[in-house]
UniProtKB/Swiss-Prot annotation:
Protein's UniProt keywords contain Acyltransferase: yes
Binding site for succinyl-CoA: 125
Keywords: Acyltransferase, Arginine metabolism, Transferase
Name the record gives this protein: Arginine N-succinyltransferase
Transmembrane segments: none
Top class in the EC scheme: transferase
HAMAP family, sorted: AstA (MF_01171)
GO molecular function: arginine N-succinyltransferase activity; N-succinylarginine dihydrolase activity
Active site feature: 229
Superkingdom field: Bacteria
Pathway involvement of the protein, from the record: Amino-acid degradation; L-arginine degradation via AST pathway; L-glutamate and succinate from L-arginine: step 1/5
EC number: 2.3.1.109
Signal sequence extent: none
Length: 350
């Protein structure tokens, strides 16, 4: 059975192995054992309540319980930019006009921005390529919203997600070549790694403080502004079906889009509800425990021992019927409450 749970120290080796499969462009999961160990400790301290909001970050793992192996990760930063500045480019417009010459021209620009300071961020989503099936991707992504819904008080009024921008098969970023290289004089992979390991001072020191004219960039760089890496397209689609939208902010390194939404307007947060657990063995006559029913995200309400699974069922009343195996995976007993929501919006066919 596949289940999502909070990260534990014993997961370090599996996460390090996953980090080796990400490729260039995923700044939040570098293959650096010391950094990953510190990231795990920060998550554990977040759950223990010993960190300020600007330092808090939750890290979840997708575990194949049969193989006893972590095969995916996803995370939430509680409030970005409160300790270290949060940078992106805002895609804007400057107007150049002259009545004397009868000239009026609007010019697209890139402004260095800290506009998302204090927002909660969805990040560090990565699934082992061998497990990119059976709805594991949407499960690992959307379970974060179910956690936010259950513990809404810990998160901001807005949620954002930086999407990995376009790089070619050699890891080359056209946006970086046309923008970042001129200010940093280092390779994209190096800047990407430094940022991912928390060494971000160089961004503030070297990035331009004045708007950049998009028309001055190479054509291939202009073409990838707001575009995602092909491998990231499914993750973007998942978030967009939940209500997140591109509002004209892009990553300063690769030009990838930032998606955002009001937290309370995200479908999973808005539509999730609570049910009381009833435990019974599967019966072919049982309408509720049905392999052909709608697919649902189900999670317990335990903050420190959060667990979530996918299950097919029909909701007929305020109770949720679970098999003993599902109840054990969730860590719940009869009479406990769980939070549930359909994995996909009712009008979305999957």
């Amino acid at each position: 059975m596949m289940k999502v749970r909070p990260v534990e120290r014993r997961d370090l080796a599996d996460i390090f192995e996953l980090a080796g499969k990400t490729g260039v462009g995923m700044t939040s999961l570098p293959q650096n054992e010391q950094h990953l160990a510190a990231r795990i400790e920060r998550a554990l301290n977040t759950w223990q309540g010993s960190l300020d909001p600007g330092e808090q970050g939750y890290l979840f793992v997708l575990e194949d319980s049969e193989q006893q192996k972590v095969v995916g990760v996803s995370a939430i930063e509680v409030a970005v930019g409160l300790n270290d500045p949060w940078y992106n480019f805002r895609v804007g417009t400057l107007v150049h006009a002259s009545k004397a010459l009868n000239v009026y021209k609007s010019v697209p620009t890139l402004f260095l921005s800290n506009d998302h300071t204090g927002y909660s961020e969805l990040c560090t989503l990565f699934l082992d390529p061998d497990y990119r099936k059976d709805k594991n991707g949407p499960f690992l992504s959307k379970v974060r919203f179910l956690f936010i819904a259950a513990f809404r008080q810990y998160f901001s009024r807005k949620v954002i997600a930086e999407m990995r921008g376009y790089t070619d098969e050699q890891g080359r970023s056209p946006f970086w070549e046309s923008v970042g290289r001129h200010f940093f004089s280092i390779e994209f992979a190096k800047a990407d790694y430094l940022s991912g390991t928390g060494q971000k001072a160089f961004i503030a020191e070297l990035m331009p403080k004045h708007p950049l004219y998009v028309d001055f960039l190479a054509e291939e760089a202009r073409a990838v502004i707001g575009q995602v890496h092909p491998h990231t397209a499914p993750a973007r689609a998942v978030l967009e079906t939940e209500g997140l939208q591109y509002q004209g902010y892009v990553d300063i390194f690769d030009g990838g889009p930032t998606l955002e939404a009001n937290t309370d307007d995200v479908r999973v947060v808005r539509d999730s509800s609570k049910r009381t657990v009833v435990i019974k063995d599967y019966d072919i006559e049982d309408y509720d425990i049905d392999p052909n029913g709608r697919l649902y995200l189900v999670a317990n309400d335990h903050y420190h021992h959060f667990r979530a699974i996918l299950m097919n069922t029909h909701l007929s009343d305020e109770r949720l019927r679970l098999t003993p195996e599902s109840a054990e995976a969730l860590g719940v007993a009869a009479g406990d409450s769980v939070r549930i929501v359909s994995l996909f919006a009712p009008e979305t066919k999957r």
